[in-house]
């Protein structure tokens, strides 16, 4: 069983989340990586995140660009801590994703790190796991 579930919305996002893989590995934290879109595969994505606790995951890292629905969507279907990583994309170069990740409605908590900062997302996950 892995401790951290890492989800991004598109295969093209993988290079942006890969720094988290290195941080988690160095810290001895197991993780599992998935590509699943809140927009294109909402049912599959909901099932993946809803079942995370039963599979032994303790933290979710969700990365997305543009409208960046994935972190908030993930937080809406789990009670696990969700860390959102906004990705630089489109004409606003990630500002839209940052605001979407940081401004999730009340009652749907998402911890938000800086644009393209998968390293800090992984470091935060490690701290949560060690708390």
Spans of model-derived segments:
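Glycine-rich phosphate-binding loop
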Residues: 47-86
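N-terminal beta-loop-helix "entrance" segment that forms/cooperates
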Residues: 33-55
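Glycine-rich phosphate/diphosphate-binding loop of Rossmann-like nucleotide-binding domains
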Residues: 2-40
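C-terminal binding/interaction regions
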Residues: 8-15, 19, 93-131
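Short, solvent-exposed amphipathic alpha-helical segments in soluble enzyme
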Residues: 20-26, 49-50, 76-79, 127-129
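Glycine/charged-rich beta-loop-alpha catalytic/anionic-binding loops adjacent to active sites
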Residues: 2, 29-32, 55, 80, ...
């Amino acid at each position: 069983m892995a401790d951290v579930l890492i989800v991004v919305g598109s295969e093209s996002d993988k290079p942006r989340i890969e720094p988290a893989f290195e941080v988690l590995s160095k810290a001895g934290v197991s993780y599992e990586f998935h590509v699943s879109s809140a927009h294109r595969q909402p049912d599959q994505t909901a099932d993946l995140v809803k079942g995370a606790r039963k599979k032994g995951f303790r933290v979710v890292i969700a990365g997305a660009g543009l409208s960046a629905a994935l972190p908030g969507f993930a937080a809406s279907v789990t009670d696990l801590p969700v860390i959102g990583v906004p990705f630089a994309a489109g004409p606003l170069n990630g500002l839209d994703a940052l605001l979407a990740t940081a401004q999730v409605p009340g009652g749907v908590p998402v911890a938000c790190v800086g644009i393209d900062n998968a390293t800090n997302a992984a470091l935060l996950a490690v701290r949560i796991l060690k708390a």
